[in-house]
Amino acid sequence: MVQSDSPEELAQRAKPAWRLQQMPVQLSNFVSKTPLIGSEWPPTGDWRSANNNSLGDWNKCCVPGSEIPQHLGPFGNSSLTMLTAQQPGEKIHPDGGYVSPKEDGRKSSEHTNSYDVSASQSPSNDGAQSDSTSDEHIDVECMTETEMDTDEKDSTIKPEDQATPKLEEGSDSKPESTSVEGTSSNYQVTSEPVQMPQMPIPVIPSFLKNSLPAPIPITPTQSANVERSNSPSIEEALLLTLSQQQFAEVFAEAAKIRKSSSESIGFQRSGTSAFLNIEPKEMSMSSANNNNEEAPASTVSACSTPTTTTSASFCRPPGLGPVALPPTQNGQTPMLVCPICGFMCPSKFHFNSHMNTHGDHQCSMCDYTSRTEGRLKKHMRESHTVEEQLRAGFESEPAKESASSPKNLSLSKDGSATSPINEIFNLSTTMASILDSTNNAVSSTSTTEQPSALSALTLDMSSTPSLLSTLAHSSFGVSALDQIKAISENPSFMPEGGINLASALGVVSNAIKGDTPSPEKQSNGECRRSSSGKIKIFKCKQCGHQSLSKDDQWAHARTHIPAEKQLNCQHCNFVTEYKHHLEYHYRNHIGSKPFQCKKCAYNCVNKSMLNSHMKSHTNHYQFRCMDCTYATKYCHSLKLHLKKYNHRRVPEGIEMSGGDSSPPFTSDATITFSPLMKQEIKTETVEPVTSIAQPFPFNPMMGNHGLNFANHMLLNKHLDVGLMGLRNSVMSPLKCSACDFVASSADEKMRHSMSHILNSSNVPTSIASLYNSLNLPSFSHVAPDNDNALESMDCDVKIDDDNITESHCYEEMDQGSDSAVSPTGSSQISSGDEETKKCKSLSLEQISARANGNNSPMSNDSAMEKDGESADDAPHSPSDTTSVPSPPLHSSSIVAPIPITPQPNEFLQSILAQASLLGPLLANRPSAFYCDHCKIPFDTQQVLDSHMRFHTPGNPFMCSDCQYQAFNELSFALHMYQARHQ
């Protein structure tokens, strides 16, 4: 905003103007001499006299720079107004032949800015308008009130009753005031009326007309003290020529611009040339629009509200459940939202991969299940008719069949095959299959049952001599001769294409002898692509070679197969060293798939493929990951998972529940030991003891304290062993020793410790190996209470739910071992050595009594008698009859049958130490705080309530926090161990 000049400034400005009017106007008179530069100036003297020009001369020639209008307003404004060029501060008199330099510079600045503004704004693009209509673009209303007041202050005051047009600031058009100016110095305003039609209209570039919006108008205000000069300015003269209709159109355009600008937020273009380089893409697009269409201001991206875009592929919204789908903007791919957990991603591939984690896809027409949606669609296309698909609401495009597809190689009733193989061998089953089919056909003739799908059966060109022997020594009820007779009498049982039985049998014979005329070998040198478009890579199973085509893979396979063992296909470059592989390959050539699923229309070339397919009709996941809840029906899928995530497989001896076919777990059993594993416990060998040190690799435990650690090591399977002497040697019971986790309760800490055990790399596969892997810490500061601290512990293991206890672990080891270093086998060492008999382990009752803190109820003599009885019974055991005598013992103090080299394991030591503290707490817990679903007791009601909130009402094995569906209490417990829920 330009400040109004004071009277003193006007008087000062008028004085040099009056003086300059007496001077010549030529510029050469002002600058008559060349200026002095550098060393040309004299060192002393008056610099005025030394200079060639006077200060007044330089002032006369100096042209002040134009004032740059401010385009950007305050930052908080929702829109920016454009300030136009300034008007001259002095009144121009008709008799004045000279204009001051400052005034001339101001007019030149006004000329430049006025042209830029008028050229950059043109909301109406109608090129067919008349000249009078184009006058709307001439703006005479851009001056502010201050500029008007400055221009109007003069000794001559215009009467207020004189009709003057009302000016509006910020109109859509700008004047071309300089078009009627002659020169900047000789311009004079005459009293003659201005003829507007004769004024030249500047040519405005087309791209400026259509690209930039008009400036935002400001509501006009009327000043009470408006002074007008006697002679109207050029803008006023132009304004007088506008009609009332043109004024209405100008106001209408201003209203449109005001409305659009009020709806936008942010920066807007002011319409000047300073913004011509903003977003050239949108300018080019807008210039290509129709001239009759109005270019709205809202198309400028700077005016619109900035939208937050993310570069991440996935985003999980806060909370659970489905999330509203965000609207599509600028043609972007819409986000795919999981209806179960709210997972979102724009990729269909990743969305399908995520949906596979929620369960199987089941066919609505049969009991087929699949982990992927693509396999399910393929099954529905190939295994069900079109009517069934339409009835089930499944609509999809027909599957694209490749040139080598068996369907393309088979003949139809109304056409013949074009391949030479199909012209000669229209075969789809083996001879064994044709005999089976004819047997069914003969039996169906007697029962007047229409044979189903027998007309499509044909012979197999890849038959081997074993098939002919099957034909000769058939075990079917009907003889082979009767079956062949039935085929010859009923043409519907014959192969299609006009091949009779004799020619078919001849073809099989020629195929067996190798005399089959082989056409030109098919080429498989092209690169294959997967369904996702990626090039398929064929990897060699014997080395790291990779090929991009089948021919390259087969050519490389010849380097691994000896020449005398290579079996080559006659129709392509396939090579193998196994006959059954060649037979399967031939079946693929001719479409022979005799193995068919009884539950769907799937058929394949061998039995193993059918067995693998039958898993899709079951819900039993026998292959499981130990480190996560991943389970699959196929071993190959599990191997890929383990390789990808570096996880471990659940040992075969441990059967973890999952699926409908798995046996249900009882209240307190989570891991079942198979008979194979029990046999492993019995048959585990024991090395002879050569050391006379302690019987166990760890320090002896106190005999009158109990440790309930197996309740957590084996998930509610505990060993009643006294280890309460460890109470004073452990760290804080609520902090994990393996990590920085701090539990809020004892149960939470134990569950956290179990997650470390389950995720450890060395998982024991038997009770004995588990027992041996537990290296207890050394507690030398604990004083023994009695002299029996060196005795062994009772390691009875409760496995079954009916509380049937296995035999003592020492005795079971002795029964299956080949050595004789055991309490029962020690009698074979020396029958006359009494000291050797005394070194045998005590009986089960003695160990249990000492573990409970009681003295032995038997005397030493009775103990010796029991030892003698066990020694007498030892030769009757099967293991003792086949055992090998062990080397002589060097000490009589050896008690333990399982000596192991100490392997320090600080983590397991800390777990056992923590479990010793929790033993009495877990044993004395009140039964009121008990989870009926997980069969786990808790200390307090608060802990139980915190646990129960994860059970979904109506579906207790579904996690209410992440919607994970568990199979039973074990899988739910594993999920709670692995998931970090708050």
From Swiss-Prot:
Residues 87-194, 377-415, 811-896 are annotated as: Disordered. A zinc finger (C2H2-type) spans 336-358, 361-384, 538-560, 567-589, 595-617, 623-647, 734-756, 929-951, 957-981. GO terms for biological process: egg-laying behavior; embryo development ending in birth or egg hatching; negative regulation of transcription by RNA polymerase II; nematode larval development; protein metabolic process; regulation of development, heterochronic; regulation of transcription by RNA polymerase II. Residues 101-110, 153-175, 863-875 have a biased composition (Basic and acidic residues). The lineage of its organism: Eukaryota, Metazoa, Ecdysozoa, Nematoda, Chromadorea. Keywords: Developmental protein, DNA-binding, Metal-binding, Nucleus, Repeat, Zinc, Zinc-finger. PANTHER family: C2H2-TYPE DOMAIN-CONTAINING PROTEIN, ZINC FINGER PROTEIN. The keyword RNA-binding does not apply. Required for the late stages of development. Plays a role in the developmental timing of postembryonic hypodermal seam cell fusion events and adult alae production. Changing residue 83 to M: In mg285; causes precocious hypodermal seam cell fusion and adult alae production in larval stages L3 and L4. SUPFAM superfamilies: beta-beta-alpha zinc fingers (SSF57667). It holds the Pfam family zf-C2H2. GO terms for cellular component: nucleus. Signal peptide: none annotated. This is Hunchback-like protein. Gene3D superfamilies: Classic Zinc Finger (3.30.160.60). It is found in: Nucleus. It comes from the Eukaryota. GO terms for molecular function: DNA-binding transcription factor activity, RNA polymerase II-specific; RNA polymerase II transcription regulatory region sequence-specific DNA binding; zinc ion binding. Disulfide bonds: none annotated. Expressed primarily in ectodermal cells during embryonic and larval development. Residues 142-152 have a biased composition (Acidic residues). Residues 111-132, 176-193, 816-831, 843-862 have a biased composition (Polar residues). Disruption phenotype: RNAi-mediated knockdown results in premature alae formation at the L3 larval stage. This phenotype is partially suppressed in a sea-2 bp283 mutant background.
